Amino acid sequence: MTCLECKKELGYVDHKNAMDSLGVELCVKHHKRMQELIKKNDTPLEAIQLYYGLKEAGVNAMLEWWNGKKSIDIAISRVKLNIEIDSEYDKLTEEQAINNLEEAMHSFKNGFTTIRIPHIVVRYYLNETVRNIIGIMEGLKANIKAI
Ligand SMILES: [Zn+2]
């Protein structure tokens, strides 16, 4: 059991605390830092889990990236991919849905691709989600080369 951020060895209690509250293995310092980030940005837990899932797979992503207008849950700048975790997609109103579409349109115009992932997909299919994102990144990279 080591911290996913700094590789520090974790004791039983520290490991349990981090797993119980975030679902990821973090030392006391990085656990605290993550909780401050959540408090500040209202970050969904699944965004943190996906961020570390991507990191484990060797993908360099940013958590809570400020794009000048809003904070994006996860951004992969190399291929200009923004990932938003939909926590309450089941309660999505038509107004929120059209706002999401409009946001996606604006980010496309700026060269960014936005994908929205329902939080339960991250929770139950983390490995598959990571694999699909890596596939999307490869597709985007190929398209960038083609232009
Ligand atoms: Zn750490």
Where are these regions (language model features)?
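Nucleic-acid endo/exonuclease domains
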Residues: M1-I147
